[in-house]
Amino acid sequence: NGEGENNYLIDWEKPLIGEAAQDLGHFLAPTTTYWKTDVLLTKEQKHDFVKQYQSCCKNTVEYEELQYRTDRYETMTCLRGVTWCAMAWVEYQDPNRPIQNQATYQKIQDYLTEDFLNWIWNSYFA
């Protein structure tokens, strides 16, 4: 909703009571935030989001533990996102592919650039 406004995390894909860190990791991962926008959150922005989320949990979870688990899920989400993009890129090479979306194809190509892949590597694995 923007700077100074309330923002909410709602899992529309599989609404169930589960691991909050998994939803947070998916929501904050660059392979999610950058998909339909040009937003790449800083580490500080992501940690601030987790702190705000944790403060709403009425102390049912310790911040350090939640941040640790969120970081692990975020890493795996990045791996899944990049490998999905590699698969989608191959699919888009077929000129008879029934669905072609130029914006999606461009974003897939963005994710597979050496700069983006190096950024993921340095952010999560170096």
Predicted regions and their residues:
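ATP/Mg2+ or Mg2+-diphosphate-binding catalytic cores
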Residues: 81-126
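Active-site acidic catalytic loop and adjacent metal/ATP-binding pocket
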Residues: 1-22
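Active-site activation/catalytic loop segments of kinase-like enzymes and analogous catalytic loops
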Residues: 21-59, 75-94
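All-alpha amphipathic helical-bundle segments outside canonical DNA-binding/catalytic cores
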Residues: 60-75
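Glycine-rich, flexible loop segments associated with nucleotide phosphate handling
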Residues: 5-8, 40-48, 99-111
